[in-house]
Amino acid sequence: MLTAEQIEATLSDNDILDIVLDAEQEVIEGVQDCIDGHVLPLIIKGPPGVGKSQLVEEMTIAAGIISTDYIGSSWSAPDKDSGLPAYPYHCDNLVTVKGALMRGADYSVWALAADLYANKDGGVICLDDNDAILRDKTAGALLMKATEQRAVKPISYIKANSTHELQMYGVESTFNVNTSIIILTNLDMEEDIRIANQKQKDGTPKKEHISRWEAFISRGKYIDLQMNSPRSIRVYCEHKIESVKMLTQSAYLERTCGRSLTKKENAEALKWIRQNQSRLSNALDLRTYNKLASIMIRRANWQKSAEVSLLS
């Protein structure tokens, strides 16, 4: 039986790109289905820095989604002489965001409870490469409740009665939720589940978070972007750069460096990455190309500067 590496060796770059673009189209349809309430949760697996977050943000904004951010809002305590109870606080400035509420690695269980409560009647919560939350028992239980296939999804979090931040926001210990949830991850959940199930046959107990992941995939949708090798990541990045003119019509480069790359410089950048990908200090992603482009614009001897900055 051929390994994944052996199979990839038989494919052209165009073959690989077709596979990745088919997966990307599935993601686009999955995000829309999640927004519409047909898929819960949507799990998208892919490497960091290839545009997963941007796609979710753009699609949820285009759909007119408005999400509420209690954590980013301003709150003030009641006047001690007013006779009012200590909680909840008064919200001086309620923050809402266009599109999904994007939550990264610096995230805790109480924050998840706050986000679910703030968006219990709508909005989209997107957990963005937040592996710790996906393994946390309490957070997993909240997400399990929030993704049940039923019209009314009751959430229970008893610590809401004793957590200062949740008391401040007025988060109840029990509430119903109707929130679309998207999970972006570079964890290969399906492979981890396969390994755990095999070990279970040999007598090794399955970890709790693996069982929850199985439930998430069963009730929702799991999409692998098929960027599972350095070559497939490079092929997709090159396609993205060319299709959206990421380096030749770049608002980012024009703001930070005064101009974008010329077409000739763009070709040189792609060639340099191809020749040096195996020597990069960090895994290749779209940000790598922006870093290289910035060096090319700012340094006369850019090849030497790029070697020092980007290669190991």
Question: How would you describe each model-predicted region?
Answer:
Residues 2-35:
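N-terminal pre-Walker A segment at the start of P-loop NTPase domains
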Residues 36-56:
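Walker A/P-loop nucleotide-binding motif
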Residues 65-123:
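Short glycine-rich substrate-engagement loop in P-loop NTPases that contacts/grips substrate
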Residues 121-125, 175-182:
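Loop/turn-to-beta-strand initiation segments
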Residues 128-130:
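Walker B catalytic acidic pair
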Residues 135-176, 184-186:
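Conserved catalytic/switch belt of AAA+ P-loop NTPases
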Residues 194-231:
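A short helix-turn-beta junction within AAA+ P-loop NTPase domains corresponding to the substrate/partner-engaging
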Residues 233-309:
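Conserved AAA+ ATPase small/helical "lid" subdomain
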